[in-house]
Regions:
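Juxtamembrane loop-to-helix connectors within ABC transporter transmembrane domains
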Residues: 20, 29, 37, 116, ...
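Helix-loop-helix
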Residues: 186-200, 270-343, 348-349
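Alpha-helical segments in transporter systems
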Residues: 34, 42-67, 98, 113-117, ...
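Transmembrane helix-loop-helix hairpins at lipid-water interfaces of multipass membrane proteins
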Residues: 44-108, 189-193, 304-308
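ABC-type nucleotide-binding domain
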Residues: 357-358, 364-612
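Transmembrane helices of ABC transporter permease
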Residues: 39, 43-56, 101, 168-222, ...
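An intracellular "coupling" helix at the cytosolic face of ABC transporter transmembrane type-1 domains
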Residues: 39, 140-141, 159-166, 170, ...
Length: 612
């Protein structure tokens, strides 16, 4: 399970993202994030104003509280000396004013938090929407070389990490720097000498922060990356758990998962360890400054240079001064997490897209469905060509069968026909027009597909059949189901056509899934049909019934059929026999048997197996 074999149509290169991903571009990622945030600048301006206002009111508190302390101390001294007592009325006024400041600060803090949450959620919504739209524009090669879980991790884990860390870090950046500046001003107004002593802790703090951030940066990156790998493995194994059990591969799967999970554990442990180190180290450094200021303040009070209330205010300011420094360390940590998640999201959004529109698009209206392969060369990698100089002309209404052993290039031909991949050289033509001259969406509307891997979504049977033609009436849906010989089966189900299929459509059999996908293709009424192992998952009796229905459907339409059971394509107008990417034989069934070549060998070997 360690390597994925292409996409749902098979073929394609192996792949997956590894640990060799490019190094983090922290500054570039933050610039991109700021560009996104600039669209919410009005909200961010209000966040800035309310955060600054809340912080300023909070900063003023210790200074005012110091006045109350001074008033109490003066009153006590006066009472001892017999001159006067404590002025409780004045103290009450000071405390009421102080309470009003703190209440206002709390209200401002609530408002800025409310606005910032809205901004971060709007950004999250936008990024999820862009990723969802981006997925539909991505080339098939991207999904053939990555696990589903890795892509899903960008939409879920990375976006959630970005939203949460942004919501916290943006506000803390504002409040931390405002607090540092405001507290510094208040400290200088009380005592420049005490301020100088308090500032001596800064070089130590900054040095420790810088060291820890540098060490934690790469671990946060690895944590996000391998979280995607773990999700991909879980999704892959869960989707194929029956196969895993059938081949007794539980131990191998667990071993592979443990290896990836171990890397994730180590990265997460180290990143969280360094993150957790910041707070106790910064608190220790802050306490050193606190002790130094307390000693100096007592000395200055004895010298009557400052008042007792100023000492209390200054000590509280020292505590408030070290707290935002600690918060800056936490913000630096969160910014690393934000940048790591943002980079993965932006990397996905900046992936190369398919060209959806041609410069001078050809209209699909009135096209008949003649197809020509003109000396086609193709390889998933430029240095490994798997289709060499393939040429064939298919007239409208013909039934074309493509046969050959596994890996011969049969499914690849279909991918090229639908422009999931572009040819390396020469061209594929429809009614004389190069496929590249069509808009991709309009081109694919010409095709109806019944794939080997049936795909049905969570919804009613009626909705699944109607997927090929959303404006189809209920009567048209039923007629398509009858043509696919699935109508009688649907009638036996609870709620009939309104029965809900579960997430993996496991409440119907594989053969019934195949019939429903055939009904969907019939309803779409395409000009060109692609049948990839269309009847390989049903019993012989059902296969015969489906074959008759498909013969009626294919009459008058260009049809491409990929099948390993050669008995199903004996009436094909043209059979292309592929081996190692080349067409080595072509003709109808009788002609190919007379040639007594590779096709005859394949056909006779299947006949012998059937007889045995």
């Amino acid at each position: 399970m360690s390597k994925r074999q292409g996409g749902p149509m098979g073929g394609g290169p192996h792949g997956g993202m590894g640990a060799g991903e490019k190094a983090k571009d922290f500054k570039g990622t933050i610039r991109k994030l700021m560009k996104y945030l600039s669209e919410y600048k009005i909200g961010l301006i209000f966040v800035l104003l309310f955060a600054i206002g809340s912080t300023i009111f909070n900063i003023a508190g210790p200074k005012i509280l110091g006045k109350a302390t001074t008033e109490i101390f003066t009153g006590l001294v006066g009472k001892v000396s017999g001159s006067s007592g404590i002025d409780f009325e004045k103290i009450a006024h000071i405390l009421i004013f102080l309470m009003c400041l703190y209440v206002t600060s709390a209200i401002f803090s609530f408002i800025q938090g409310y606005i910032m949450t809205g901004v971060s959620q709007k950004l999250t919504y936008r990024l999820r929407k862009e990723i969802s739209e981006k997925i539909n524009r991505m080339p098939m090669n991207y999904f053939d070389t990555r696990t589903h879980g890795e892509v899903l991790s960008r939409v879920t884990n990375d976006i959630d990490t970005l939203s949460q860390s942004l919501n916290q870090s943006a506000t803390q950046i504002i409040t931390s720097f405002t607090t540092i500046i405001g507290v510094l001003i208040m400290m200088l107004s009380i005592s420049p000498l005490m301020t100088l002593v308090a500032l001596l802790i800064l070089p130590i703090s900054l040095g420790l922060i810088s060291t820890i951030v540098k060490r934690s940066q790469r671990h946060f990156k690895n944590q996000q990356e391998y979280l995607g790998h773990v999700n991909g493995q879980v999704e892959e194994v869960y989707g194929g758990h029956n196969i895993v059990k059938a081949f007794n591969k539980e131990a191998d799967v667990i071993k592979e998962f443990d290896e990836t999970n171990e890397i994730l554990y180590q990265s997460a442990w180290k990143s969280q360890f360094f993150s957790g180190m910041m707070m106790p180290i910064m608190q220790f450094v802050g306490n050193l400054g606190y002790v130094a200021v307390a000693i100096l303040g007592g000395y200055l009070a004895i010298k009557k240079t400052i008042e007792v209330g100023d000492i209390q205010s200054f000590i509280q300011y020292v505590r408030n001064f070290t707290q935002p420094i600690t918060q800056v360390a936490q913000v630096a940590n969160m910014l690393q997490s934000t940048a790591a998640a943002s980079e993965r999201v932006f990397e996905f959004l900046e992936e190369e897209e398919e060209d959806q529109f041609a410069q001078n698009p050809v209209s699909v209206e009135g096209l008949e469905g003649n197809v020509e392969f003109d000396h086609v060369h193709f390889g998933y990698n430029a240095d490994k060509i798997i289709i060499n100089d393939f040429s064939a002309k298919v007239k409208q209404g013909q039934k074309i069968a493509i046969v050959g052993p596994t890996g011969a290039g049969k499914t690849t031909m279909i991918k090229l026909l639908m422009r999931f991949y572009d040819v390396n050289s020469c061209a594929i033509l429809i009614d004389g027009h190069n496929l590249k001259d069509f808009n991709r969406g309009e081109l694919r509307q010409m095709f109806g597909m019944v794939l080997q891997d049936t795909w049905l979504f969570h919804g009613s049977i009626k909705e699944n059949i109607r997927y090929g033609k959303l404006d189809a009436t209920d009567e048209e849906v039923i007629e398509a189901a009858k043509a696919a010989h699935v109508h009688r089966f649907v009638q036996t189900l609870p709620n009939g056509y309104d029965m809900e299929l579960n997430e993996e459509a496991s409440n119907v059999s594989q053969g019934q899934k195949q019939l429903l996908t055939i009904a969907r293709a019939i309803l779409a009424d395409p000009k060109i049909l692609i049948l990839d192992e269309a009847t390989s998952s049903v019993d012989t009796r059902t296969e015969v019934r489906i074959q008759k229905a498909m013969d009626n459907l294919m009459r008058g339409r260009t049809s491409f059929i990929i099948a390993h059971r050669l008995s199903t394509i004996r009436d094909a107008d043209l059979i292309l026999v592929m081996k190692d990417g080349d067409i080595i034989e072509q003709g109808n069934h009788e002609e190919l048997l007379k040639q007594n070549g590779f096709y005859a060998e394949l056909y006779n070997s299947q006949f012998e197996k059937t007889s045995a």
